[in-house]
């Protein structure tokens, strides 16, 4: 299992880098550390949703932990449950 620390800002300016880093972890279980996230924008959310779908389709686990309060607050504002951004993989 690989752990990847997300940047403090997941927005237009940082989206390409985040996407590249996440794609580089394809094919293995992944933990995204969102503990330092201070801003989650719509594009950052889209990248995380796409990653969750890719990991689910591959039968791999994708977990987001730890999470900052700002990250959790953004999910509430977007109206999405954390489960939409994670994958349990195949047991």
Identify what each model region corresponds to.
Residues 1-43, 47-91:
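STAS-like cytosolic regulatory interaction modules
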């Amino acid at each position: 299992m690989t752990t990847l620390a997300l940047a403090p800002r997941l927005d237009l300016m940082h989206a390409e880098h985040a996407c590249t880093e996440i794609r580089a972890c394809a094919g293995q279980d992944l933990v995204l550390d969102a503990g330092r996230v201070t801003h989650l924008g719509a594009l950052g959310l889209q990248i995380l949703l796409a990653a969750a779908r890719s990991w689910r389709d591959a039968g791999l686990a994708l977990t987001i932990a730890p999470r900052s309060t700002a990250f959790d607050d953004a999910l509430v504002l977007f109206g999405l449950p954390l489960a939409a951004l994670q994958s349990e993989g195949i047991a």
